[in-house]
Regions:
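Ferredoxin-reductase
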Residues: 1-80
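A generic structural signal for residues embedded in beta-strands
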Residues: 36, 84-85, 226
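Structural signal for conserved beta-strand scaffold positions within catalytic alpha/beta enzyme cores
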Residues: 6, 51, 154-156, 208, ...
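Short, surface-exposed secondary-structure boundary micro-motifs
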Residues: 39, 87-88, 229
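FNR/FR-type flavoprotein reductase catalytic core
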Residues: 71-215
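Local cysteine-cluster metal-coordination motifs and their immediate loop/turn environment
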Residues: 112, 189, 211-241
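Short, Lys/Arg- and Gly-enriched loop/turn segments at beta-strand edges
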Residues: 42-50, 89-99, 236
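Short Fe-S-cluster ligation motifs
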Residues: 234-238, 242-265
């Protein structure tokens, strides 16, 4: 079992948990994720690691309360324990110096984007971050992003903060003013779908970090399978990052919606 060291509310249904996991903290890299379970009969939920402190032996997770299991995690407090925490899983982000990198995050996807932003910036890239949220209250980790990038562009659906518009508007504004060598996108599948469609038009290599339904995290169950370039891939072992222009997002969206009625219970 893993103890929760601290808890912070980003909004009414989004929390940040700092969890004791010294082995994971030492070995994790940008892009890695863990699978979390609360209670012996709880659902196994994949969560990308948003940060780690090797000195304290902790990792940071950001969770949005959507279904029953994620709500249970969000209800935990400092001092409580997570029943199972497995990781680090998946393939780490390929980090190299490529030039200008645009990192686009929507919603809670901003959290796992942070270590990727940090890694690309440390590698000597010019990193521009586009943060998107519905309203000002839902914008998270802006300060941390500014500390680890060259520029941060904030987009809100209602214009209550930053610039009114969608994440794609922010990304395109950068493309229109300077050469972009790589785009990394994380967030809801529909957000990544439209970011991918935009960058494909401009022939900009793009990586999408996918968060699909998972059970075992080893590729055995096949719950996380997706189609990439016409071939079946498993997000838990082959990903979570893929060439966004090759991902069948429509299929992914259909699979993600398969259990929505059950998740509401």
């Amino acid at each position: 079992m893993n103890k929760i060291v601290s808890k912070e509310h980003f909004s009414a249904n989004v929390v940040k948990l700092e969890v004791e996991a010294p082995l994971i903290a030492r070995s994790r890299k940008a892009g890695h994720f863990v699978i979390v379970k609360v209670g012996e009969k709880g659902e196994r939920i994949p969560l990308t690691i948003a940060g780690a402190d090797t000195t304290k032996g902790t990792i940071t997770l950001v969770i949005q309360a959507v279904g029953g299991s994620s709500k249970k995690i969000c209800e935990l407090n400092a001092g409580d324990y997570i029943t199972d925490l497995v990781g680090p899983l998946g393939q780490a982000t390929h980090i190299e110096k490529v030039g200008t990198v645009v990192c686009a995050g929507g919603g809670v996807g901003v959290a796992p984007l942070l270590p990727i932003v940090e890694a690309f910036h440390k590698a000597g890239n010019r990193v521009i971050v586009v943060l998107a949220a519905r309203t000002k209250e839902l914008v998270i980790l802006e300060e941390q992003m500014r500390a680890n990038s060259d520029e941060v562009i904030v987009m809100t659906d209602d214009g209550s903060y930053g610039t009114k518009g969608l994440v794609t508007n922010g990304v395109e504004s950068v493309i229109n003013r300077e050469k972009v060598d790589l785009c990394v996108t994380i967030g809801p599948a529909v957000v990544m779908k439209f970011v991918s469609a935009l960058t494909k038009k401009y022939e900009i290599p793009t990586v999408a970090s996918l968060n699909t339904i998972m059970v075992d995290g080893t590729g055995m169950c096949g719950a996380c399978r997706i189609t990439v370039g016409g071939k079946t891939k498993f997000v838990c072992v082959d990903g979570p990052e893929f060439d966004a222009h090759q991902v069948d997002f429509d299929e992914m969206l259909m699979r993600l919606g398969a259990y929505k009625d059950i998740e509401k219970k």
